[in-house]
Every structure is written in C-alpha cells, then in structure tokens.
Amino acid sequence: MADRVPDAIATIFTDAFTGTAATGGFVGSGIMLAIQFGVARGIFSNESGMGSAAIAAAAAKTQHPARQALVSMTQTFIDTIIVVTITGLVIVTAGTWDMGRDQAAIMTASAFGQALPGEWGSLIVSVALIFFAFSTILGWSYYGERAIVALVGDWASIPYRMFFTALSFVGAVASLELAWTFSDLSNGLMAIPNLIGLLILSGLVVRETREYLDWDPKLTKSPDEVAGFVARQKMNWR
C-alpha cells in the first residue's frame, strides 16, 4: 500500500482543483466544494478560531497564560496536519473515498480493514470511534456548562446537564446529514463572534506574547517573580 501514497497525494490535489465529479466529498468535486468541506471538517477536527479550546486550556495549571496558549497551538498541527492527513491517505490509497459522505465511519473502517491483516483494521477503528465519540460528548458538555454558568450562574449547571444528555440522544438517532448540518451551523455561529474578538484583541495578544517570550521562555524564575510578572500583565490589560 505504501507504493500508492504518491498517487494518492496527486489524486487529492488534482481532483480537488480540476472539478472531478467525485461522490465521496473527501476529494471533492471542485475547488469551492473542496474549500467548503475542508474548512468545515478542519474546524470540526481542531476547533481553530471557535474559542472552545480556550475553555479547556483555561482549566490547565500553568505559570502563565501565554505558556498554555503556545502549547494549545500544537493541537491544530497534530489534529489536522498529522492525524487527518494520515487518515486521508489511508482512505484514498484503499480506494474507499468514493463511498459517499454519509458513510464516513464505514469508509474509514473499510480502508483500515484493507490496510491491516484480518479484522484488526475495522476493530481498531470501531473501538477508537467509541472512545472518540464519548470523549467528544464529555468535552463539549464541559464547554457548554462553563459558558452557561458564566452567563447565568451556577444554578444552571444541573438543568444544562439534563438538557445536554437529552440532546445527545437526539443526535444519536437523527440522520447523519442533519447532524453534520447542525454541527457546521453551530461551529460557524461560534467562530464569527470569536474571530471578530480575536481581530480586535490581536494587538494585545502580540504584545503579551512578545513580553512573555522576552521575559523568560523557560520560566526558571522563582514563584514570587512569576506572580509579580502575572500581576503586572493583568494591570496592563486594563
């Protein structure tokens, strides 16, 4: 299968930009469709620009926010450049990319089933999907709970959990097309105000990041010095 990788890479680029009538949606049927699905699925994978990953990063214990922010930046590279690229190459080399967008899980399982001996490929993908789906539910539940608590207070935590649990069941029995459409719409509604905020605060981010890197990239100073530095940054934000 390794000898098919160069052809797979060529197929991805040629079919994305020449308008080949592909049915899979992975390669796409034109440059606009390629961009549409690429951006939509990329955001769904790495949450770039949505502001949701910052909620999880804010819960981390770190000596300075800029340090955690720099670490969080790696998730886009790992999720999209490494994991998604490898998965895409497996699907294209296996020839399962034209099964249709509604058969995404079967498409991936079938591709890995051809790549690995016996039933190991399909089994690994099936088990991984269970863990990925469960962890995704937990993650987005946490994101939403932090948001609702910040908006209306702690009393909304329990009602939100009940509503989220019920909505998870609805998502499990709804059609895949409806689930994808709702997810893409929700991601867009999150990204638009967040990107506006990022643009407005871009100068602040650049200033604070430069000061952090110039101050001490390795954070080898004492805790008191770190606390003083953080306090000065908070004053500068006003």
Please place each PLM-identified region on the residue numbering.
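Membrane-interfacial loop-to-helix junctions in multi-pass transporters
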Residues: 18-33, 114-123, 154-159, 175-176
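Hydrophobic core segments of alpha-helical transmembrane domains in multi-pass membrane transport
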Residues: 85-94, 125-136, 163-175, 191, ...
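Terminal cytosolic tails of multi-pass membrane transporters
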Residues: 188, 192-238
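Helix-loop-helix hairpins and the membrane-proximal interhelical loops
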Residues: 1-39
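Re-entrant/interfacial helical elements at transmembrane boundaries that shape
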Residues: 51-60, 90-94, 106-110, 142, ...
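Membrane-interface interhelical connector segments
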Residues: 93-119
